[in-house]
Amino acid sequence: MVELMVVIFIIGIASAAVVMTVRSPDRGVRDEAERFAARVAALRDNAIVQSRSMAVTIRPSGYGFERRDNGAWVPLSEAPFTSTDWQRGTSVQMSGARQMRVAFDSTGMPSSAANIIIKHDNVAVTLALAATGDVRVVR
C-alpha cells in the first residue's frame, strides 16, 4: 500500500512539473503585445514629462518612436525607444492602413484612437489605444 502511495505521489509531482512548463499558445504574441503597449505608454508619459509631441510609427515590419523637433519628426534612438522589428511570423492590422503614426501631444492625448491587431501563429490580440491615451492589450 505504501509503495502505491509513493508511485501516485511521484506521478503527481511529474505531472505538475509538466503542467508548469507547458506554454499557452497565445503567450508569445501576448508577451509581444504587452511589451509594445508598455513602450507606447512610456512614450505617452515621456511626451507629458518633456512637454513635447512624440509619436509611435507602426509598420508591417515593426515599430519606431519619434519626437517633434523644429517642425519635423526625428527618430528616437535611446532606450527604450529604439526601433523594433516584430518577431518572425508576426503580422499587424491597423484599420486597413499599411502604416500608422499615432502622435501624443504634451498632455498625453493621442492624435487618434486606434485598435492594432497583432497576429502570430493563428493567435491574435488587440492593442487598444483609447482617445484618452489609455493603452491596453485585449484578447
Where are these regions (language model features)?
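N-terminal helix-rich module
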Residues: 13-139
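N-terminal signal-anchor/signal peptide hydrophobic helix marking the start
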Residues: 1-9
